[in-house]
Amino acid sequence: MEGSEAGGGGLLQQILSLRLVPRVGNGTTYSSPLSTFPEMWYGVFLWALVSSLSFHVPAALLALFTLRHHKYGRFMSVSLLLMGIVGPITAGILTSAAIAGVYRAAGKKMIPFEALIFEVGQTFCVVVVSFLRILATL
């Protein structure tokens, strides 16, 4: 699988190549922590993108399914999908840089699992705040 895809690895291949998820049972620990600013920033940013899309893609599919007969409502799924991409690109870049900057200034190395925890936690907070804002309008 390593040499079978020439050039077109995609997002999943990039995530797996950074070892952002620890492999259990193969005896390896965090042999390559993220130590430079670009490595930390990229690792945190990828998890921001993946975790945001994991919430927004099912929501967009649900909106498309439930509003498929509505004249203008079916376009809500497109806006949900765009927010799943635009959110991490704008806010995710800044927060990833802030997290990586703090780690770099402190002289710490980031294990890849920390990048996962930071961004999944941030995405969870964004989803909770968004849900509570929608409930307040009902």
Swiss-Prot record:
As for subcellular location, the record says: Endoplasmic reticulum membrane; Nucleus envelope
Q: Which residues lie on this side of the membrane: Lumenal?
A: 1-44, 101-110
Which biological process terms from the Gene Ontology are attached to this UniProt entry? Answer: endoplasmic reticulum tubular network organization
Pfam entry (one): Tmemb_170
UniProt keywords (A-Z) are: Endoplasmic reticulum, Glycoprotein, Membrane, Nucleus, Transmembrane, Transmembrane helix
**Keyword Cell inner membrane applies:** no
Q: How does it sit in the membrane?
A: Multi-pass membrane protein
| Cytoplasmic membrane side | 66-79, 132-138
Residue ranges spanning the membrane: these are 45-65, 80-100, 111-131
**What are the record's GO terms for cellular component?**
endoplasmic reticulum membrane; nuclear envelope
Where is this chain glycosylated? 26
Functionally, this protein is described as follows: May regulate membrane morphogenesis in the endoplasmic reticulum (ER) by promoting ER sheet formation at the expense of ER tubules.
Please state which protein family the record places this protein in: Belongs to the TMEM170 family.
Protein name per the record: Transmembrane protein 170A
Q: Which organism is it from?
A: Gallus gallus (Chicken)
